[in-house]
């Protein structure tokens, strides 16, 4: 492998939505930082078999924040 072209690969902590924490190696963040998940396999409808959750401040909120003042009326 070439030196100096690859991102730093280090240990981080990942906090699941139920509060459990595990360590893994990643290029995200800095050594020892904690990545807090908003959705994970314990809460995602695809793995739990539940119904789909409504937007929790995600895409729809971003769209409304960005384009909320626009109107199609002339």
Swiss-Prot record:
Molecular functions (GO terms): rRNA binding; structural constituent of ribosome
Regions crossing the membrane: none
Swiss-Prot/TrEMBL GO biological process terms: translation
Single GO cellular component term: ribosome
Coiled coil residues, start to end: none
Keyword set, alphabetical order: Ribonucleoprotein, Ribosomal protein, RNA-binding, rRNA-binding
NCBIfam families linked to this entry: L31, PRK00528.1
Family label: Belongs to the bacterial ribosomal protein bL31 family. Type A subfamily.
Function: Binds the 23S rRNA.
Oligomer status and interactors: Part of the 50S ribosomal subunit.
Name of this chain's protein: Large ribosomal subunit protein bL31
């Amino acid at each position: 492998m070439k030196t100096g072209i690859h991102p730093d690969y280090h240990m981080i902590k990942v906090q699941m939505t139920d509060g459990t924490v595990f360590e893994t190696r990643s290029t995200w963040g800095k050594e020892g930082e904690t990545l807090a998940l908003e959705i994970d396999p314990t809460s995602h409808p695809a793995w739990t078999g539940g119904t789909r959750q409504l937007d929790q401040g995600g895409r729809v909120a971003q769209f409304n924040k960005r384009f909320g003042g626009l109107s199609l009326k002339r």
